[in-house]
Protein backbone atom coordinates (compact mmCIF):
# COMPACT_ATOMS: atom_id res chain seq x y z
CA UNK A 1 0.00 0.00 0.00
CA UNK A 2 1.25 3.48 -0.92
CA UNK A 3 2.47 5.47 2.08
CA UNK A 4 0.69 8.80 2.62
CA UNK A 5 2.81 11.70 3.86
CA UNK A 6 2.14 15.21 5.07
CA UNK A 7 4.10 18.09 3.54
CA UNK A 8 6.59 18.21 6.42
CA UNK A 9 6.97 14.41 6.41
CA UNK A 10 7.66 14.50 2.67
CA UNK A 11 10.30 17.19 3.22
CA UNK A 12 12.06 15.18 5.95
CA UNK A 13 12.04 11.95 3.94
CA UNK A 14 13.33 13.83 0.90
CA UNK A 15 16.15 15.31 2.99
CA UNK A 16 17.19 11.91 4.35
CA UNK A 17 17.12 10.36 0.86
CA UNK A 18 19.17 13.24 -0.54
CA UNK A 19 21.82 13.42 2.16
CA UNK A 20 22.32 9.65 2.21
CA UNK A 21 23.56 9.93 -1.38
CA UNK A 22 25.13 13.39 -1.60
CA UNK A 23 26.82 13.61 1.83
CA UNK A 24 27.20 10.01 3.04
CA UNK A 25 29.95 11.01 5.47
CA UNK A 26 27.38 13.04 7.46
CA UNK A 27 24.61 10.43 7.32
CA UNK A 28 22.64 9.50 9.49
CA UNK A 29 21.62 13.06 10.36
CA UNK A 30 21.14 14.78 13.71
CA UNK A 31 18.00 16.77 14.50
CA UNK A 32 19.92 19.98 13.86
CA UNK A 33 21.17 18.75 10.48
CA UNK A 34 17.70 17.59 9.43
CA UNK A 35 16.23 20.97 10.36
CA UNK A 36 18.94 22.87 8.50
CA UNK A 37 18.50 20.72 5.39
CA UNK A 38 14.70 21.06 5.50
CA UNK A 39 14.94 24.85 5.61
CA UNK A 40 17.77 25.41 3.14
CA UNK A 41 16.92 27.86 0.38
CA UNK A 42 18.61 25.95 -2.46
CA UNK A 43 17.02 22.89 -4.06
CA UNK A 44 13.81 23.35 -2.07
CA UNK A 45 10.34 24.32 -3.32
CA UNK A 46 8.66 25.72 -1.35
CA UNK A 47 11.26 27.13 1.03
CA UNK A 48 10.14 26.22 4.54
CA UNK A 49 10.94 27.58 8.00
CA UNK A 50 10.40 24.61 10.27
CA UNK A 51 11.46 24.85 13.91
CA UNK A 52 13.45 22.07 15.57
CA UNK A 53 10.34 21.19 17.57
CA UNK A 54 8.29 20.84 14.39
CA UNK A 55 10.98 18.69 12.80
CA UNK A 56 11.22 16.56 15.94
CA UNK A 57 7.45 16.03 15.91
CA UNK A 58 7.66 15.08 12.24
CA UNK A 59 10.46 12.62 12.95
CA UNK A 60 8.36 11.10 15.73
CA UNK A 61 5.44 10.71 13.31
CA UNK A 62 7.67 9.03 10.73
CA UNK A 63 9.11 6.75 13.40
CA UNK A 64 5.58 5.70 14.33
CA UNK A 65 5.04 4.82 10.65
CA UNK A 66 8.27 2.78 10.63
CA UNK A 67 9.69 5.07 7.94
CA UNK A 68 12.78 6.17 9.88
CA UNK A 69 15.23 4.58 12.27
CA UNK A 70 16.71 6.30 15.33
CA UNK A 71 20.39 5.68 15.95
CA UNK A 72 21.43 6.67 19.47
CA UNK A 73 25.03 7.66 20.08
CA UNK A 74 27.27 9.27 22.67
CA UNK A 75 26.62 12.74 21.25
CA UNK A 76 23.12 12.96 19.79
CA UNK A 77 20.40 10.83 18.28
CA UNK A 78 20.72 10.50 14.54
CA UNK A 79 18.11 9.57 11.98
CA UNK A 80 18.11 7.45 8.84
CA UNK A 81 15.22 6.54 6.57
CA UNK A 82 13.54 3.18 6.09
CA UNK A 83 11.50 4.58 3.22
CA UNK A 84 12.99 2.38 0.49
CA UNK A 85 15.90 0.14 -0.46
CA UNK A 86 16.39 -1.31 3.02
CA UNK A 87 15.71 -4.74 4.44
CA UNK A 88 12.81 -3.19 6.38
CA UNK A 89 11.06 -1.59 3.39
CA UNK A 90 8.93 -3.20 0.69
CA UNK A 91 9.72 -0.41 -1.76
CA UNK A 92 12.86 -1.09 -3.80
CA UNK A 93 13.93 1.53 -6.34
CA UNK A 94 16.77 1.87 -8.82
CA UNK A 95 19.20 4.78 -8.23
CA UNK A 96 17.53 6.75 -11.03
CA UNK A 97 14.02 6.10 -9.72
CA UNK A 98 15.09 7.07 -6.19
CA UNK A 99 16.67 10.29 -7.45
CA UNK A 100 13.47 11.26 -9.26
CA UNK A 101 11.27 10.60 -6.22
CA UNK A 102 13.70 12.51 -4.00
CA UNK A 103 13.70 15.60 -6.23
CA UNK A 104 9.90 15.55 -6.40
CA UNK A 105 9.62 15.29 -2.61
CA UNK A 106 11.95 18.27 -2.20
CA UNK A 107 10.93 20.43 -5.16
CA UNK A 108 7.43 19.39 -6.17
CA UNK A 109 6.27 18.51 -9.71
CA UNK A 110 9.00 18.49 -12.37
CA UNK A 111 9.34 18.17 -16.14
CA UNK A 112 11.61 15.43 -17.53
CA UNK A 113 14.13 18.10 -18.52
CA UNK A 114 14.18 19.57 -15.02
CA UNK A 115 14.57 16.11 -13.51
CA UNK A 116 17.52 15.30 -15.76
CA UNK A 117 19.37 18.34 -14.41
CA UNK A 118 18.23 18.32 -10.79
CA UNK A 119 18.61 14.58 -10.22
CA UNK A 120 22.04 14.47 -11.87
CA UNK A 121 23.96 14.72 -8.59
CA UNK A 122 22.15 11.66 -7.23
CA UNK A 123 21.99 9.48 -10.34
CA UNK A 124 23.45 10.09 -13.77
CA UNK A 125 21.11 10.57 -16.72
CA UNK A 126 22.83 10.71 -20.10
CA UNK A 127 19.65 11.64 -21.96
CA UNK A 128 16.13 12.80 -21.16
CA UNK A 129 14.86 9.50 -22.61
CA UNK A 130 16.32 7.78 -19.54
CA UNK A 131 14.30 10.10 -17.32
CA UNK A 132 11.11 9.33 -19.24
CA UNK A 133 11.82 5.60 -19.02
CA UNK A 134 12.25 5.83 -15.24
CA UNK A 135 9.06 7.92 -14.97
CA UNK A 136 7.10 5.30 -16.91
CA UNK A 137 8.47 2.61 -14.59
CA UNK A 138 7.41 4.63 -11.53
CA UNK A 139 3.86 4.76 -12.86
CA UNK A 140 3.55 1.04 -12.08
CA UNK A 141 5.70 -0.33 -9.27
CA UNK A 142 4.17 -3.61 -8.14
CA UNK A 143 0.74 -2.28 -9.02
CA UNK A 144 1.27 1.08 -7.28
CA UNK A 145 1.36 4.39 -9.14
CA UNK A 146 4.18 6.30 -7.46
CA UNK A 147 4.23 9.07 -10.09
CA UNK A 148 1.52 10.71 -12.22
CA UNK A 149 1.67 13.02 -15.22
CA UNK A 150 -0.03 16.37 -14.68
CA UNK A 151 -1.96 18.49 -17.14
CA UNK A 152 0.39 20.60 -19.23
CA UNK A 153 0.50 24.21 -18.05
CA UNK A 154 -0.43 26.92 -20.59
CA UNK A 155 2.60 28.01 -22.60
CA UNK A 156 4.76 25.09 -21.43
CA UNK A 157 6.36 22.60 -23.83
CA UNK A 158 6.58 19.72 -21.36
CA UNK A 159 4.16 18.16 -18.91
CA UNK A 160 5.20 17.95 -15.29
CA UNK A 161 5.22 14.79 -13.20
CA UNK A 162 4.38 14.51 -9.50
CA UNK A 163 5.01 11.91 -6.80
CA UNK A 164 1.97 10.46 -5.03
CA UNK A 165 3.21 10.12 -1.45
CA UNK A 166 2.27 13.73 -0.67
CA UNK A 167 -0.42 15.19 -2.93
CA UNK A 168 -0.88 18.87 -3.62
CA UNK A 169 -4.60 19.55 -4.01
CA UNK A 170 -3.85 22.05 -6.80
CA UNK A 171 -2.33 19.38 -9.05
CA UNK A 172 -4.49 18.27 -11.99
CA UNK A 173 -3.67 14.80 -13.32
CA UNK A 174 -3.48 14.38 -17.09
CA UNK A 175 -5.61 11.63 -18.63
CA UNK A 176 -3.91 11.79 -22.02
CA UNK A 177 -1.92 8.72 -23.14
CA UNK A 178 1.73 8.80 -22.18
CA UNK A 179 3.93 10.19 -24.95
CA UNK A 180 6.77 7.98 -26.11
CA UNK A 181 10.16 9.47 -25.40
CA UNK A 182 11.12 9.58 -29.08
CA UNK A 183 7.72 10.44 -30.56
CA UNK A 184 8.90 13.84 -31.71
CA UNK A 185 12.24 15.40 -32.46
CA UNK A 186 12.87 19.07 -31.53
CA UNK A 187 14.35 21.34 -34.16
CA UNK A 188 17.96 22.47 -33.94
CA UNK A 189 17.20 25.89 -32.44
CA UNK A 190 15.04 24.42 -29.68
CA UNK A 191 17.70 21.83 -28.92
CA UNK A 192 20.37 24.54 -28.61
CA UNK A 193 18.20 26.62 -26.26
CA UNK A 194 17.36 23.59 -24.14
CA UNK A 195 21.03 22.58 -23.96
CA UNK A 196 22.10 26.08 -22.89
CA UNK A 197 19.35 26.23 -20.26
CA UNK A 198 20.32 22.82 -18.92
CA UNK A 199 24.01 23.75 -18.73
CA UNK A 200 23.22 26.98 -16.90
CA UNK A 201 20.95 25.24 -14.41
CA UNK A 202 23.58 22.55 -13.86
CA UNK A 203 26.12 25.25 -12.96
CA UNK A 204 23.63 26.86 -10.57
CA UNK A 205 22.88 23.49 -8.96
CA UNK A 206 26.61 22.85 -8.53
CA UNK A 207 27.00 26.20 -6.76
CA UNK A 208 23.97 25.47 -4.59
CA UNK A 209 25.44 22.09 -3.67
CA UNK A 210 28.69 23.78 -2.63
CA UNK A 211 26.81 26.26 -0.45
CA UNK A 212 24.76 23.45 1.08
CA UNK A 213 27.90 21.45 1.83
CA UNK A 214 29.53 24.47 3.49
CA UNK A 215 26.42 25.07 5.57
CA UNK A 216 26.40 21.47 6.74
CA UNK A 217 30.08 21.65 7.65
CA UNK A 218 29.49 24.90 9.55
CA UNK A 219 26.62 23.33 11.48
CA UNK A 220 28.83 20.36 12.30
CA UNK A 221 31.56 22.69 13.60
CA UNK A 222 29.00 24.60 15.69
CA UNK A 223 27.71 21.35 17.16
CA UNK A 224 31.23 20.19 18.01
CA UNK A 225 32.04 23.56 19.61
CA UNK A 226 28.84 23.46 21.66
CA UNK A 227 29.71 20.00 22.93
CA UNK A 228 33.25 21.10 23.88
CA UNK A 229 31.99 24.12 25.82
CA UNK A 230 29.36 22.26 27.83
Curated annotation (Swiss-Prot):
TM region(s), chain numbering: none
Signal peptide stretch: none
Domain of life: Bacteria
Family per record: Belongs to the UPF0502 family.
HAMAP family reported for this sequence: UPF0502
Name recorded for this polypeptide: UPF0502 protein Patl_1161
UniProt organism field: Pseudoalteromonas atlantica (strain T6c / ATCC BAA-1087)
Amino acid sequence: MLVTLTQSQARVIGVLLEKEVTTPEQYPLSLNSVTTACNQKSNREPVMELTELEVQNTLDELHAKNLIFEQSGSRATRYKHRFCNTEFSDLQLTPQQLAIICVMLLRGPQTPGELRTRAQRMAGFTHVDEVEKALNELMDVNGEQLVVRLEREPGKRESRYAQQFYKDTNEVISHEPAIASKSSQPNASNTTVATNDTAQEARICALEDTVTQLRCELEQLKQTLDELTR
